[in-house]
Swiss-Prot record:
It is found in: Secreted. The keyword Secreted applies. This is Vasoactive intestinal peptide. Keywords: Amidation, Hormone, Secreted. The modification Asparagine amide is found at residue 28.
Amino acid sequence: HSDAVFTDNYTRLRKQMAVKKYLNSILN
């Protein structure tokens, strides 16, 4: 199911972005 794969990748991408924002907020 390509839709499920897209959702999984999107969720993973969102998590990575959230982690980067979190780290930036700590470091700055």
